[in-house]
Amino acid sequence: MPKLRSATSTEGRNMAGARALWRATGVKDNDFGKPIIAIANSFTQFVPGHVHLKDMGSLVAGAIEEAGGIAKEFNTIAVDDGIAMGHGGMLYSLPSRELIADSVEYMVNAHCADALVCISNCDKITPGMLMAALRLNIPVVFVSGGPMEAGKTKLSDKLIKLDLVDAMVAAADSSVSDEDSAKIERSACPTCGSCSGMFTANSMNCLTEALGLSLPGNGSMLATHSDRRELFLEAGRRVMALTKRYYEQDDVSALPRNIASFKAFENAMALDIAMGGSSNTVLHLLAAAQEADVAFTMDDIDRMSRQVPHLCKVAPSTAKYHMEDVHRAGGVMGILGELDRAGLLHTDVPHVAADAGGNLKSVLAKYDVMQTQDDKVKQFFMAGPAGIPTTKAFSQDCRWPSLDDDRREGCIRSREFAFSQEGGLAVLSGNLADNGCIVKTAGVDESNLTFTGSARVYESQDDAVAGILGGEVVAGDVVVIRYEGPKGGPGMQEMLYPTSYLKSRGLGKACALITDGRFSGGTSGLSIGHVSPEAAAGGTIALIENGDRIEIDIPKRSIKLAVSDAELAARRETMLARGPMAWKPLSRQRYVSMALKAYAMLATSADKGAVRDRSKLED
């Protein structure tokens, strides 16, 4: 049987000092020998998705200790991408993912914890903790803070649903009055929780369910609803069950690398494509797969994007549905159930919600609202919003009058009635992106599935924003924002402001945007990101000139710079002649801290998940 990792610091005369310190944290004589469960919390008052997490660790700890474990909590950092947006703060967002992963690894390994509960929520926190959990490969359960309720307000006597992006677009639209803009801003984010649409945070929390590492409802149950409390308690109980299975029964199926297998990554990607998740999820799944030593690549994503239909359309792709509506329709388990009936899901994989010997099939039998016979499960998915602004978790217990089980015209569709037979994300490739790039097709209007336009090139997001607002960009342009990749930014900024401002100026369907940076989960429109290789790594995007014709064909998965090979070769020679300034922006003025320079030295392009280049670290 595997020995408890914590025995390293709790057994033997040579560990008398360590035991003395453990005692000072509250450990008693009869506690030694029990498994020590680390609780990685990410509470912070900076982030609405985390502002309510302060007491969640205590909830989980109570369940752990009741089940026979010792619970020890620590915190990680958490960056709010929305607050960091539009200024130099966004340079720190993606690099914070690596810091979070490292900090969890450091704490767990330094203190020899036996298992782990990850309390996450927003954009880089769930991916960072996921990377750490797969790196550590000890029993783990994820439980997130949950999504906020959708904003709601009346404009022109019409009640509308809102989110963060609506506030940004309205503020930049000169046709919207100051009064209406302020009204939208005050209504857009009414409660604690991750932003209410299918943005990056909610997408990633949904994907942990599909990977098998979190409980049903984790991705969709509102932060404000009292039912969410049980998820935290059950996370504590489940991690103890997994811990006992591994350390007492030598059951390796309880370990995250055996749960998050290649099949599980395919399930997660199938879910992502079906629900039109944030394009950032591609970046994070690729990074997590590398930590798990799973050979899941852009080629797999490309293949699956052609097979999996788009079954669930949620804000920002539509104003009609938000996460509260996804939950009413059955949440992640509802979407997975439809994928299963379409023959597009592996159900023979382990899941933390399954008992020993169980798998995803047994979890779906209980939690898919279209097949369950459990009235408690149906009540669980009827949990709805209260419409009361609050920063408190579990503050309301409102319920919808019924489930949304309409698979023809509801929030979640069956394959037969899918929004489209090809999914909500696509991988494009061509001479402009030799290693691929990503477009969130769920947010692209049908009229823009093919697009040809003239390049309007900017070497920073700031310059692009100034150009868009200053009238430089006109209908038919393809806005190219380069040197914003993981290495070139550094930090791979999100481009939510440029896409929002294109919309506010009436160019949302008249222009395309291409970048080696990335997009917020709140982005929609013909926005193509993650261009690889990035400009700073010698990618063709660095060679584009103003006026070049760019051809985009999403159905054919193609993106082409209509410039001859000979001309591109000549431009490449000219670039190389710059010497030390080759593959660097000439006009951009940007302060880059030592911390960001250190990140850039090891960063890979987006097709590798923007993780560290291991070849530079190996002996």
UniProtKB/Swiss-Prot annotation:
Task: Give all N6-carboxylysine modified positions.
Answer: 124
Enzyme Commission number(s): 4.2.1.9
Major enzyme class = lyase
Residues reported to bind [2Fe-2S] cluster: 122, 195
Q: Which GO terms describe its cellular component?
A: cytosol
Write out the GO biological process terms.
Answer: isoleucine biosynthetic process; L-valine biosynthetic process
* Disulfide bonding pattern of the chain: none
Q: Which InterPro entries match?
A: Dihydro-acid_dehy_C, DihydroxyA_deHydtase, DiOHA_6PGluconate_deHydtase_CS, ILV_EDD_C, ILV_EDD_N, IlvD/EDD_N
This protein's pathway reads: Amino-acid biosynthesis; L-isoleucine biosynthesis; L-isoleucine from 2-oxobutanoate: step 3/4; Amino-acid biosynthesis; L-valine biosynthesis; L-valine from pyruvate: step 3/4
- What Pfam family is a match for this entry? ILVD_EDD_N
Per UniProt, the cofactor note for this protein states:
Binds 1 [2Fe-2S] cluster per subunit. This cluster acts as a Lewis acid cofactor.
Q: Which domain of life is it from?
A: Bacteria
- Residues annotated as catalytic: 520 (proton acceptor)
Any one GO molecular function term: 2 iron, 2 sulfur cluster binding
Catalysed reactions listed for this entry? (2R)-2,3-dihydroxy-3-methylbutanoate = 3-methyl-2-oxobutanoate + H2O; (2R,3R)-2,3-dihydroxy-3-methylpentanoate = (S)-3-methyl-2-oxopentanoate + H2O
Q: Does the keyword Oxidoreductase apply?
A: no
The residues listed in the UniProt record as binding Mg(2+), with positions renumbered to this chain, are 81, 123-124, 494
| Keyword terms of this UniProt record | 2Fe-2S, Amino-acid biosynthesis, Branched-chain amino acid biosynthesis, Iron, Iron-sulfur, Lyase, Magnesium, Metal-binding
Q: Could you say which cofactors this protein requires? A: [2Fe-2S] cluster; Mg(2+)
Query: What is the annotated quaternary arrangement, including any partners?
Result: Homodimer.
Q: Which protein family is named in the record? A: Belongs to the IlvD/Edd family.
Classification via PANTHER family: D-XYLONATE DEHYDRATASE (PTHR43661), D-XYLONATE DEHYDRATASE YAGF-RELATED (PTHR43661:SF3)
Q: What is this protein called?
A: Dihydroxy-acid dehydratase
Provenance organism: Shewanella sp. (strain MR-7)
Gene designation per UniProt? ilvD
